Amino acid sequence: MGLEGASGAISSLCLPGLSQFTWLQYRYANLLQPSQFHGEPCNFSDKEVEDCVTSRPCRSQVRCEGFVCAQTGRCVNRRLLCNGDNDCGDQSDEANCRRIYKKCQHEMDQYWGIGSLASGINLFTNSFEGPVLDHRYYAGGCSPHYILNTRFRKPYNVESYMPQTQGKYEFILKDYESYSDFERKVTEKTASRSGFSFGFKMPGIFELGISSQSDRGKHYIRRTKRFSHTKSVFLHARSDLEVAHYKLKPRSLMLHYEFLQRVKRLPLEYSYGEYRDLFRDFGTHYITEAVLGGIYEYTLVMNKEAMERGDYTLNNVHACAKNDFKIGGAIEEVYVSLGVSVGKCRGILNEIKDRNKRDTMVEDLVVLVRGGASEHITTLAYQELPTADLMQEWGDAVQYNPAIIKVKVEPLYELVTATDFAYSSTVKQNMKQALEEFQKEVSSCHCAPCQGNGVPVLKGSRCDCICPVGSQGLACEVSYRKNIPIDGKWNCWSNWSSCSGRRKTRQRQCNNPPPQNGGSPCSGPASETLDCS
């Protein structure tokens, strides 16, 4: 474990009225080697801040033609003073009012999930961070928006928030004859996008994955990874429920005052440490469009040899699972019409409920539920296949507590405009440069390989191994399975080459670890090329 020292920069914290100005100066350190396998993590801060005095003048600010808020520094239109809303974010627009002229006479709710939609998102970890947009700012607007007889107030930043009609709860079932197929088509969709690299622009709307650092992410990895390079087959079922579509205004956004002040304090002289702290606290991107709702998915892991002994096919399992949800096992004739005997279907369904038997067909039931957070629903979901009643209960909960399941995003630096910030082009360019450094620093490629197909996760200055069920130890080195195939994993990207012919390139190697004992090679490109100038 080690930190590399680096020089810092000076950033202004100007106090008007003094002959000299108080500034802050910083220095920071980069992570050279994370700790792992019980090594000591870095036990000191990777940055230092102290006051300094200089005769350098304060950085100029964007001129405000309206009212300058006392604490937040926000510039608001004077027509918003004394209207009963906290337009400043610090109530200074409502101070010293002889009379309050309330724009809204009735209480109105906030849109479901609107707080998360205003947050920045770290796409390297799929985690929501601090607020970058102010979705409690209405600019005096008060037209009610009715959804299911509930009156909502539309924030100034929001272009549209459209409810979606709740349809039937239907599962789409797909089967996979090997873990490698299952991982490529299913598991990798839930992973965070730590490897994206096309200028940090994400084209189109995409599904938001599960953070491998979250409890749910770790649980899912442990339960599914144990079946890598086994003779198991997989039946994956998924039901999507959309309750609302969200779209942000394309321009003239009201930034959250905390984010506004942090960006104003960034040094114009490039210093990675301060920009890194911004990404840590506010994420790497912000959401421009989103689908809110829920995803209910489960995976049945079946023992292929046990299925053959019992004269079962994957199609039999597929038919029994699909139709048990529809009829709840009540109409025996339906199974016969599917070409599956009642006894066969009962055998499969009973094994799902009692997975403590030895040498059974059903090796595991792995469930992942997003949206409709409820301890009661989650407990039921992890015990058995979903029923119509459970899905109805889950759907009702999703309506009022939806998850953000799909997003369209823009890099955080796109919020830095000349409307709010002086020297915006300089700050924006610094943020672009820092984002590339940040991606390198937080990548788990810095971790030593975990054994037994364990998954390394870098958190802070420490690497941990998420071990498949059946493996344990700091490096997943204790396992009942011997000489198993080891899948290859990528090492870190090299630095970009210098710009030549308006192109630059970088490479990486599949050696962390390399494939062993017939394991799968790394997926994805070994080199990348980008335009440059």
For every predicted segment, state its role.
Residues V76-N77, V334:
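A generic hydrophobic-helix recognition signal that picks specific residues
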